[in-house]
Amino acid sequence: MTQRVRTRFAPSPTGFIHLGNIRSALYPWAFARKMKGDFILRIEDTDVERSTQEAVDVILEAMDWLGLDIDEGPFYQMQRMDRYREVIAQMVAQDLAYPCYMSTEELDALREAQRVRGEKPRYDGTWRPEPGKVLPTPPAGVQPVIRFKNPIGGSVVWDDAVKGRIEISNDELDDLVIARPDGTPTYNFCVVVDDMDMRITHVIRGDDHVNNTPRQINILRALGGTPPIYAHLPTVLNEQGEKMSKRHGAMSVTGYRDAGYLPEAVVNYLARLGWAHGDAEIFSREQFVEWFDLEHLGKSPAQYNPEKLAWLNNHYIKQADNARLAELVKPFIEALGGRVEGGPQLADVMALVKDRANTLQEVAQTALLFYRTEISVAPELAAQHLTDEVRPGIMALADKLGTLPEWKREAIGAAFKEVLGAHGWKMPKLAMPVRLLVAGQLQTPSIDAVLELFGREVVLRRLAG
């Protein structure tokens, strides 16, 4: 019977989650969905000083916004301390781990001496019990760390789904501290116990964890577990070619939401940021899940391209249902000082203004002309466009618009043509002053469409003003 696929996302809640971080959730989520398996969320919060509930909330909010639903969790490492201590005690009892009383000062001196000799700095096994070895006397009043007895000789080998075969000699690995003097377990140990207890079959994570992997595999095997399949993702770089980070100006995932990006655009963009399905650039979440595999994960760092994300967002804005778009854009309009109630139907406005916008913020900026609580015309624009020459044309247009049997864009456009023909004018001569009077600005979508949405009553009142 084939083992059920179980993947996990295991972030540390230290306050910030950017696109590179959330990609490490998207890929295991997609793989679990593709394989009809389980996706688990684990919060690695053992760094008590830096971990906050607010940061956890940001992670959950980002995942919810992107639609990365979980099957189990969130599990919190700080709530599993009893389990970790149980396993540590078991390992000491089975001679898989041992207490080490070497002080920090002694360890620093040891490493400095090794550096002077040109050796790799490492713990030398002073307190490691071996047959026939006499250990030093434990110093009074000193709480030891607990170290894992790393295998001596041989090597750790795994076939990484991204990087291929990796082999690390055990001679390169010293005996890892798995519990601090106060008894709290260390990161690499907790990860192993969690992955084993949660029956994780595939670990898809950033390649900054590659160096941890041989240590984790050795501990896992010592506990009788089977290592999962590892897939270490290359780094995501920012526009300058540096590792993406808050320090280098990366935006948080929820920052993209607040800037007016659609979740489907961000998911589509992230999917291609380190994975490919032929030349496909645009695909739905469902298509992504169907296509996703580990074989086509990229082996080189992926570089963030804001223009590409904006292009994708424009595509999804254009494709979006107008009623849904209206609901999303309304807060942006209100933040700009607009009042949607009493204005044209927002969904109808979306149909007119959405095509050229790269973000919901840009949609709102264009749509705002319909929802200003008051309009005013700058004196210099009035002097330029609302001239004595053009006023008779405006009055003639108002007369024709007032008698239209139907307030439709086509009829409004025909009224413009009649007045333009009678006066021998080009469209801008009449359209510009009408825009100023009705919308308070010179730049708008097509004037006949704008007037149709404003409605006859508003248009005639403003033309008369």
From Swiss-Prot:
EC? Answer: 6.1.1.17
- For the region Disordered, what residue ranges are annotated? 120-139
Q: Which domain of life is it from?
A: Bacteria
Instruction: Recite the UniProt keywords alphabetically.
Output: Aminoacyl-tRNA synthetase, ATP-binding, Cytoplasm, Ligase, Nucleotide-binding, Protein biosynthesis
Q: Which InterPro entries match?
A: aa-tRNA-synth_I_cd-bd (IPR045462), aa-tRNA-synth_I_codon-bd_sub2 (IPR020751), aa-tRNA-synth_I_CS (IPR001412), aa_tRNA-synth_I_cd-bd_sf (IPR008925), Glu-tRNA-ligase_bac/mito (IPR004527), Glu-tRNA-synth_I_codon-bd_sub1 (IPR020752), Glu/Gln-tRNA-synth (IPR000924), Glu/Gln-tRNA-synth_Ib_cat-dom (IPR020058)
Q: Name one GO biological process term.
A: glutamyl-tRNA aminoacylation
| GO molecular function ontology, one term from the record | ATP binding
Motif 'KMSKS' region, residue range(s) on this chain: 243-247
Protein function? Catalyzes the attachment of glutamate to tRNA(Glu) in a two-step reaction: glutamate is first activated by ATP to form Glu-AMP and then transferred to the acceptor end of tRNA(Glu).
What is the name of the protein in this document?
Glutamate--tRNA ligase
